[in-house]
Amino acid sequence: MKDPRDVLKRPVITERSADLMTEKKYTFEVDVKANKTEVKDAVEQIFGVKVEKVNIMNYKGKFKRVGRYSGMTNKRRKAIVKLTEDSKEIEIFEA
């Protein structure tokens, strides 16, 4: 089993993800090779909450060129995690 801190890279903070937080849905950028079960276990271990559902999206790398040099940006994987009704909220913006 992978270390939970290797599965979750960082939270994704956008206007849409902030709106989803009111519905107990949290967005994270995760490891490209992580599956839904690993994401669920990692969130439950790190934050101490119960996860109801996990949705995962893949983003392919974009083609970029700087002068005569061309290449690709890294591919990414994003997970939206929905918590159960009785679980506490995750404090992403801790003071």
UniProtKB/Swiss-Prot annotation:
InterPro entries: Nucleotide-bd_a/b_plait_sf, Ribosomal_uL23-like, Ribosomal_uL23/eL15/eS24_sf, Ribosomal_uL23_CS. PROSITE patterns: RIBOSOMAL_L23. Gene3D superfamilies: 3.30.70.330. The keyword Ribonucleoprotein applies. The keyword RNA-binding applies. Pfam families: Ribosomal_L23. GO terms for biological process: translation. GO terms for cellular component: ribonucleoprotein complex; ribosome. GO terms for molecular function: rRNA binding; structural constituent of ribosome. Keywords: Ribonucleoprotein, Ribosomal protein, RNA-binding, rRNA-binding. One of the early assembly proteins it binds 23S rRNA. One of the proteins that surrounds the polypeptide exit tunnel on the outside of the ribosome. Forms the main docking site for trigger factor binding to the ribosome. Part of the 50S ribosomal subunit. Contacts protein L29, and trigger factor when it is bound to the ribosome. Belongs to the universal ribosomal protein uL23 family. PANTHER family: 60S RIBOSOMAL PROTEIN L23A. This is Large ribosomal subunit protein uL23. The gene is rplW.
